[in-house]
A protein has these predicted regions:
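Extracellular/periplasmic carbohydrate-active domains that bind, remodel
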Residues: 15, 19-473
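Bacterial N-terminal signal peptides that target proteins for export
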Residues: 1-11
């Protein structure tokens, strides 16, 4: 066939269509393949099982009057059950006051539906000090309200209620802010012997065994913390009024958090903060918090880099978020990195919810954040941005030598009804610390301002509408 101009045009057009088709096919295949990784992760997360014996705390002297301190009775029941090979510690109907509860391997704490556990607000009830992390920094501090260290096969289940009783008159005032009850002359974590001292220990890499906080240091304990544990189940209970972070799995793996209701609007009341954890499922939970609803972390600054353990292989699905600084969050204590995160089918909305999807770090904290996949998120109202990536979080910390890298982030099928920004990204000048961000098939309505994207590398928007206008690039 003679190669005239018409034939050449037809051939070029045919090749172009073929290339577009192949590219689209590869994109679909690639997206499908990425989410297959989530199925693989899910297959590795297995809920723990427990021996059949049941140990009622009433048989160990617990009193359900809401006034008697039951710390010894509850922990005696746990010790007895552990020495008997494990089983279920039953919290029956009634109101029980307690201090720190320390779980042991092969123990399930089960709350009957009308059971309520009140936690003392006396700091002395959380001594002796235990090894922990506080805001991503290693130390010895007050025991978390419920704590486990180096355990396997542990659980808290049942439709009862855990109440930390924190408020402006006790733990929250330690923040050092008037909004949470602090007054001039009162001690707080801002004292030289508090948070600033721990920050100094971190920077100077003082041995952890010398970092003794606790009394007169005013660092609030988290509600639930499991440190270097395996095979964890948290299911069905309501948890409220935490002193600090609410659920804090730390350096742990094979974790299931399912059907939990978090109602805790105090300062730093993050809902669920897996830190340097692997293989995590957070499913069907409700979060109404005073800080981030779910925040993935991996240590702060030099401590995080010393461990160098990312949070990885996390699935979040079918959750609802109400109040909070962010719905799905990565950071800011993220020095060990974060990867292979899959979030889908969540709903979030509140005038007191600042952002829906949030990544936050800076050049002091650093961290590589990569392979993040988020889809099918329904957002009603947020007060700031639907999607925010901030590599200059807390600029008062100054510039550091550990620039972060946020890359390979895939966000699709997001709808929102009201926000100041649809997308807000802030990188670092002269650095490409935000790159390969893909936002597709999203519709943002009721947006007040243009998207703000500064100091970022490749950001691709495909089939994205803001206030009804297509903004593909």
């Amino acid at each position: 066939m003679p190669m005239n101009r018409s034939n050449v045009s037809i051939i070029i057009a045919t090749i172009s269509v073929y290339i577009v088709f192949c590219c689209n096919a590869r994109t679909v295949e690639s997206t499908h393949t990425k989410w297959e990784k989530a199925d693989s992760i899910l297959s590795e997360i297995v809920e723990p099982s427990f021996p059949s014996p049941v140990f009622n705390i009433m048989d160990f002297g617990a009193v359900a009057d809401g006034k008697t301190l039951n710390t010894i009775a509850i922990n005696n029941a746990i010790t007895y059950a552990s020495e008997s090979g494990g089983g279920t510690i039953l919290i029956p109907g009634g109101t029980f006051l307690t201090g720190a509860i320390h779980l042991k391997s092969n123990i399930r704490l089960h709350l009957e539906e009308n059971a309520s556990v009140l936690f003392s607000v006396n700091p002395e009830d959380y001594l002796p000090l235990v090894i922990t992390r506080w805001e991503g920094m290693d130390c010895y501090n007050y025991s978390p309200l419920i704590y486990g260290y180096n355990l396997e096969n542990i659980a808290i289940t049942g439709k009862g209620r855990l109440n930390g009783q924190a408020d402006h008159t006790n733990w929250w005032a330690w923040k050092g802010q008037r909004a949470y009850g602090w007054q001039t002359g009162m001690p707080s974590q801002l004292n030289a012997e508090g948070r600033p001292l721990l920050m100094k220990y971190n920077t100077e890499q003082i041995p952890v065994e010398q970092r003794l906080m606790g009394e007169e240091h005013y660092l609030r304990p988290p509600f639930i913390q499991f440190y270097q544990c395996k095979n964890i189940l948290l299911q069905d209970f309501t948890i409220e009024n935490a002193p600090f972070w609410v659920i804090h799995p730390l350096l742990s793996e094979n974790i299931t958090v399912k059907g939990i209701r978090v109602n805790s609007n105090g300062t730093n009341n993050d809902g669920c903060d897996p830190e340097s954890c692997k293989n995590v499922l957070i499913e069907g939970c409700f979060f109404n918090t005073g800080d981030d609803c779910i925040a993935l972390k991996s240590g702060r600054n030099d401590d995080g880099r010393r461990w160098n353990i990312p949070t990885e292989n996390v699935i979040v699905r079918n959750c609802k978020m109400q109040n909070g600084h962010g719905g799905i969050v990565i950071g800011s204590e993220i020095s060990g990195g974060c990867r292979n995160i899959f979030v889908e089918n969540c709903e979030m909305s509140s005038p007191e919810l600042d952002r829906a999807i949030r990544i936050k770090t800076n050049s002091q904290r650093g961290g590589i954040i990569e392979h993040i996949h988020i889809r099918n998120i329904r957002v009603g109202e947020v007060s700031e941005a639907v999607i925010k990536i901030d590599c200059q979080y807390e600029p008062q910390e100054g510039h550091g030598n550990y620039p972060p890298l946020v890359k390979n982030v895939h966000i699709s099928d997001i709808t929102s009804r009201k926000a100041k920004y649809a997308v807000f990204m802030l990188g670092i000048k002269n650095l490409v610390c935000i790159n390969d961000i893909f936002i597709s098939n999203c519709e943002f309505s009721g947006v007040e301002r243009e998207s703000n994207i500064q100091e970022a590398g490749r950001v691709v928007m495909d089939k994205v509408k803001i206030n009804g206008t297509l903004v593909n690039n």
